[in-house]
Amino acid sequence: MLITPDISALSYKRQLAKRFDRASQSYDSYADFQKVVLERLLAMLPLNQADVVLDLGTGTGQALGILSERLNPKCNIALDLSLQMLAVASERFSSLHNTHYVCADAERLPLQDRSCDLVFSSLAIQWCLSPLDLFKELYRVIKPGGYVVFSTLSQGSMPEISKAWFGLDNKEHVHQYMASDALLDSIRASELNLLSSQLSNISMWFDSPESAIYSLKKVGASLIASDGDPSVSPSKWKAFLLEYEKQRNELGIPLSYQVSFVVAQRPNSI
């Protein structure tokens, strides 16, 4: 699904939740890219203890166990827009008795002001509609001196898909992610202090164009317009796959992402 002006915010969030609900059972089997990003993000944690940790966009809980082990929190908050993702996470970590599973929108957090020592989020905030509003909300719930550590997709992700579609039609088939500079400007405008940021190109490789697209769909991140879009005919879809196949090299079919890794902090004095 593409985010367009004619899709209301509520409708968009409902569709997003349904998409990730459908992917909840297959997510872990296809989340190779997500695991690579998570490992790098965890290495950027600026603290070794935190009383209250919010895992924003927890999904199936890939980060929950690691955060709990490393930070020894008194309270974990696993928050996601998808109820089915939370169900998988809660079953997976049923032994974490200090963990609360919350189905909510990241842009409207049902949390008290200054309640969290750390907000951790891997590959979730790219689905938010207003980054500035999101960061203001994170500023609100973070304690003075607390941290926001996140990764997100940035402009230039999945160029292989855009290239394969080029010339076949004039439509956007990949979500237009925010430019890294604009993302950092939003963080600064929220009054969070930007401590560090990295923009990295991460490439994954597949046996076929179909398997590359499947890897998106099975984690709920299918952004190909043909997914439920009757305007893409079978013949046009076949033409797309043939164009994508032309990008094969000795490693296979590429699918690459621009990933922003960010550490920010709420000032101690505010």
Swiss-Prot record:
It is an enzyme of class 2 (transferase). Its EC number is 2.1.1.197. It holds the Pfam family Methyltransf_11. It catalyses: malonyl-[ACP] + S-adenosyl-L-methionine = malonyl-[ACP] methyl ester + S-adenosyl-L-homocysteine. Keywords: Biotin biosynthesis, Methyltransferase, S-adenosyl-L-methionine, Transferase. One of its GO terms (biological process) is methylation. Pathway: Cofactor biosynthesis; biotin biosynthesis. The keyword Plastid does not apply. CDD domains: AdoMet_MTases. One of its GO terms (molecular function) is malonyl-CoA methyltransferase activity. Belongs to the methyltransferase superfamily. Converts the free carboxyl group of a malonyl-thioester to its methyl ester by transfer of a methyl group from S-adenosyl-L-methionine (SAM). It allows to synthesize pimeloyl-ACP via the fatty acid synthetic pathway. This is Malonyl-[acyl-carrier protein] O-methyltransferase. It comes from Marinomonas sp. (strain MWYL1). The gene is bioC.
